[in-house]
Curated annotation (Swiss-Prot):
Keyword set, alphabetical order: Cytoplasm, GTP-binding, Hydrolase, Magnesium, Metal-binding, Nucleotide-binding, Potassium, tRNA processing
Cellular localisation: Cytoplasm
Ligand binding (Mg(2+)): 236, 257
Oligomeric and partner information: Homodimer. Heterotetramer of two MnmE and two MnmG subunits.
Record flagged with keyword tRNA processing: yes
Xref: NCBIfam families: mnmE_trmE_thdF (TIGR00450), small_GTP (TIGR00231)
Role, per record: Exhibits a very high intrinsic GTPase hydrolysis rate. Involved in the addition of a carboxymethylaminomethyl (cmnm) group at the wobble position (U34) of certain tRNAs, forming tRNA-cmnm(5)s(2)U34.
Full protein name: tRNA modification GTPase MnmE
Species the sequence originates in: Borrelia turicatae (strain 91E135)
Gene Ontology CC: one annotated term: cytosol
Superkingdom per UniProt: Bacteria
Listed GO biological process terms: tRNA methylation; tRNA wobble uridine modification
Presence of keyword Ribonucleoprotein: no
Enzyme class: hydrolase
Amino acid sequence: MSNLFQREDDIVALATPLLSSALCVIRSSGISSIEKFSKMFSDPKRLLEASGHTIHYGYLIDKEICEKLDEVVVCIYRAPKSFTGQNSIEVMAHGSPIGIKRIIGCFLKVGFRMAEPGEFTLRAFLAGKLDLTKAEAVNELISAKTNKTHSLAVNKLSGSLFAKIDLIKKDILNFLSALSVHLDYETSEYEVAIPFEIISKSRDELKRLVDSYNTARKLDYGIALVLAGSVNVGKSSLFNLLLKEDRAIVSSYAGTTRDYIQASFEFDGILFNVFDTAGLRETTDFVEQLGIVKSNSLIKEASLVLYVIDLSARLTNDDLKFIDSYKGHSKVIFVLNKMDLEPNRQTVEFFNSGNINSSNLVKISTKTLFGIDSLYDKIRSLTCFDYIDIDAYDVIVSSSRQAELLKKAYTLIIELLNKIEKDISYDMLAFDVYEVLNFLGEITGEVTSEDVLNNMFKNFCLGK
């Protein structure tokens, strides 16, 4: 059996990163955790007599070698009024990596074991402190990469997804109750009305939750934004501008970027994975050729392409080839850069002649920042509102486990509606309804197995 289910063990873990910092937090939980910890505290009697939700100042002491390890503040929690439902201790110590390791070592000496990933949250779930949707929201909150994903995780932590699932379950239970009454009294002279419309409503609610998972994946993985163009047109300058930091080398030498550089930035709550690619041109340099091949591959796979053109120079053959291939493509924005320089007459005439729809053009200068706001507006119009419709959902499902169970419940509901149309016997309908409720119960954790919990909580970080 996994250590995750050894609830009688006293566990300890570092809840903050193992880095040099002003403070760190070490947390522990278990039936005997306070008694064991008191053996390494400077005033053990005070801790043993302490009430829950109290804070105590003192020193941690390795009594085997009679040496003080650190000056600390200790928070005491008494069962059942703690995150895990057990006696728990949180130690705030100085963030010295060496000191932290010595303190953890002292915990182990007095009888604690290292916690498994997610074990504190699992104990909270097993103690009925939170359901599985909230437990998964804890992990989503910790790993959130943007303001939007953080807000969605907080909403789920406050119970929004559980409330939605619970509402669907109550509707289906009402249907099942009516079905059961009908089966009990089908030979009676009384006719029991069965609210079949409830199943149609539940189907629609489940469909919205299933669809929301696709939106969640886009939020989690981000939008692939590729900067492409000929050499020395300002792609790397634009890359640095989007990131608001100098990540790419900017040089007047053509071919400085010989392979792609990837980084991420947040815009309007959406994560963008931006790629600064090698300039497109004919070259005999083998390494640069490989970079150009990769550039073309990234362009094809991208959600959005910013094709950068030097407005002060003549269009290259590679520019013309790209324009011919992508001039009507909705995922491409043609960025006319270097507006701060004298424009090339032929290049200006080419774009003024209507070869490209003006709605796909943005004029900028990475040097003076001219037109940058217009570029952001264009990115927003092509991605945030069209590509990811966040506001269409009151609750968004982010977990693949939840999504899979919702798909199963939705499929069964569809089958149930088909059976209703075919006048299948009510006892057969009841069997399918129980199956739907079972899948929904697995989402919240009312119906689950040890294997499911092991698989879910192993993806949590240590100390959570």
